[in-house]
Amino acid sequence: MIELDFVDDGAIACATLKRPPANAFTADGLRQLQETVGALNANPRVRALVITGDGPKFFSAGADLNTFADGDPAVARAMATRFGSAFEALSDARFVTIAAINGYAMGGGLECALACDLRIAETHAQMALPEPSVGLLPCGLGTQTLPWLVGEGWAKKIILAGVRVDAATALRIGLVEDVVDTGAARDAALALARNVARQSPHAVAYSKELIGLARRGVPRSAALAVERERFVDLFDTSDPREGVAAFLGKRAPQWHTDGEQDR
């Protein structure tokens, strides 16, 4: 289900969700997503991951509902574990993750986008968590990630009342960061990923970790202590020296990743 390619000398990975007609997730597809993120985590050259759907209509329609047709609790538990594990891996990735929402992002498809750091939607995109309408609930982090982005009220409208959100509304409520023309989400996400790749790799990784502390409700005093430690930790790398030297020398910095030798 995951079609992977790389651009910019491997700095940016592009994962396409490809399972016609609606790019719906199966257990195997979720396992593949988790394994893909794990492999990219082990590749220090990768600075960002762009995820999009194959075709012009669907980012992903979420779970294949045929999986739950028999009402088997064992299947439900296995799939909930798969969804949770895959999207937790995506959320906790070392690199920056960007969802290029090229169409419908429904149920687990929207949860996949919610697990990413940033989201860009095309003007025709539609987003929803309609699981309660078929007797299910979001089990891929959605009940936790959505309120963080849009607040409790909108999260309840989307989940409890089954409200579908268009791209303009998603931008207004903070569900996505940008809205672009039809067919332009992947290129816009790549442009944002290139911005990420120009930053210090260690500073970005530490900053992502620190923002995650706020999201998880870590007490402010504890999070600020970690913030100070991570600032000092940067000086165990070459990034501060290179960054300041590049700024003063009016040139682009040449960053080193953990897989390369620091100066």
Can you describe what each PLM-predicted range is?
Residues 15, 33, 51, 64, ...:
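Terminal peptide-recognition signature
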Residues 31-32, 53-89, 105, 133-135, ...:
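Glycine- (often His-adjacent) and acidic-residue-rich active-site loop
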Residues 63, 150, 171, 223-226:
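Alpha-helix N-cap/N′ positions at the starts of helices
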Residues 89-204, 233, 237-238, 242-245, ...:
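Crotonase-fold acyl-CoA enzyme core
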Residues 1-52, 88:
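Conserved CoA-thioester-binding segment of acyl-CoA-metabolizing enzymes
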Residues 1-12, 44, 56, 162-168, ...:
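C-terminal alpha-helix plus adjacent terminal tail
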